[in-house]
From Swiss-Prot:
Subcellular location: Cellular thylakoid membrane
Keywords tagged on the record: Membrane, NAD, NADP, Plastoquinone, Quinone, Thylakoid, Translocase, Transmembrane, Transmembrane helix
Name this polypeptide is given: NAD(P)H-quinone oxidoreductase chain 4 1
Organism: Trichormus variabilis (strain ATCC 29413 / PCC 7937)
EC number: 7.1.1.-
Any one GO MF annotation of this record: NADH dehydrogenase (ubiquinone) activity
An annotated GO BP: electron transport coupled proton transport
Membrane topology: Multi-pass membrane protein
UniProt-listed Pfam families: Proton_antipo_M
GO cellular component labels: plasma membrane-derived thylakoid membrane
Transmembrane segments: 6-26, 36-56, 91-111, 115-135, 136-156, 169-189, 212-232, 243-263, 277-297, 314-334, 335-355, 375-397, 417-437, 464-484
Gene: ndhD1
Amino acid sequence: MNTANFPWLTTIILLPIAASLLIPIIPDKDGKTIRWYALIVGLIDFALIVYAFYTSYDFANPDLQLVESYPWVPQLDLNWSVGADGLSMPLIILTGFITTLATLAAWPVTLKPRLFYFLLLAMYGGQIAVFAVQDLLLFFLVWELELIPVYLLLAIWGGKKRQYAATKFILYTAGGSLFILLAALTMAFYGDNVTFDMRSLALKDYALNFQLLLYAGFLIAYAIKLPIIPLHTWLPDAHGEATAPAHMLLAGILLKMGGYALIRMNAGILPDAHAYFAPVLVVLGVVNIIYAALTSFAQRNLKRKIAYSSISHMGFVIIGFASFTDLGLSGAVLQMVSHGLIGASLFFLVGATYDRTHTLMLDEMGGVGKRMPKIFAMFTACSMASLALPGMSGFVAELMVFVGFATSDAYSSTFKVIVVFLMAVGVILTPIYLLSMLREIFYGKENEELVSHQQLIDAEPREVFVIACLLVPIIGIGFYPKLLTQMYDATTVQLTARLRDSVPTLAQEKPEAPKVSLSAPVIGN
């Protein structure tokens, strides 16, 4: 059967969205039918993603594949244009995997199940669209549409301060989206031909000052979603009030949208401006790693502690992105996927712990490991993955960023030594706050008041299955990272070469900018 011309990406995007529209008419009294329906739809869509990937995707091809383009507004060159390359394909697979598991994690949800699973499936298709669309205006639209399900998931099913957290989320992200719209319209109408096609936009000859302005606009929008300090404060509040499945989607997928867009738009379309902004990004990445790690250490609320840990880990993505090496950029992509798996697992376990203890304050926990040995073991394993234990995906990703940046010829030796030292400090801080967290939850003397009022039952099979599904790729990638890196190596090599080609212009026009040896080989070639 020839599947090369089948509209895989359109089908994968529209299937969960169309399925969500049927939820209001499905007969169901107690929510059980709806949740099984949502799970089956998620599994079918994920199976289609995997099948399309294995039958129609070529690892060695760095360009867009599975390309589809259907006219929408021909006068403005607006098209339903989708495609996948090495940058987007791993994140599409991650989206299908995490969202399907989040559907299973949502099993205990009983409040308005029809609306909940409607939002979950609609969000599923929308998130895949963000990683697949190749039309900039269409990208803006699906980026904006993603805000609605997340807002409602926070505002309806969140904790006591859910309205505050949801409002803060929508204000931050919608405000950032204005910069995307302004930049998109400006780029589209620049020059003689009007177009929103990303590939055509990348070929336009923008003046350097114009590139810098566009880059800054995109950076603000994507820095909010990644997030980059100081535009991060919405995330701890959102995580502090979210339910377990919303946690998994926030940590596992939503943050990756910011990292993906930063690489796709800022580096892919505006490489000359990237050469100017790269040193600033490195500094911001270091601030993310150190500041968020120290803040996480000080948190007494379990959800907020893990939220700041996520911000810290995103610092490695930023530094790898700005390294000008194949290895660093490859590590940044690997870190996004790795953190998606690890972050989803930790927040799921935080939810499982809260369901039993009914508290998030570490001061009110203690000694529960004896009563919940399975949750204790799973929490420990996922925490080890988060602190980058060798043999797990986080170790490989952070090591690649370390080596990629350290071997970069785009920065002075002094600057590299300082940055690598501070990155190492962040790596040391991570086990300090994670191991202390485990000690306060599971070790020590039991909180007698907690034990007397709560039934501390251990993990049920559904919870063990979700964590097992997440740990398998975490460990698999840790021992054999080529499982993942082979998907995108060709794309990252091509993108890094384009970024390095832009640096001679920088060196000529601005001598004080980071030095680059034009004759030096690109790392990984």
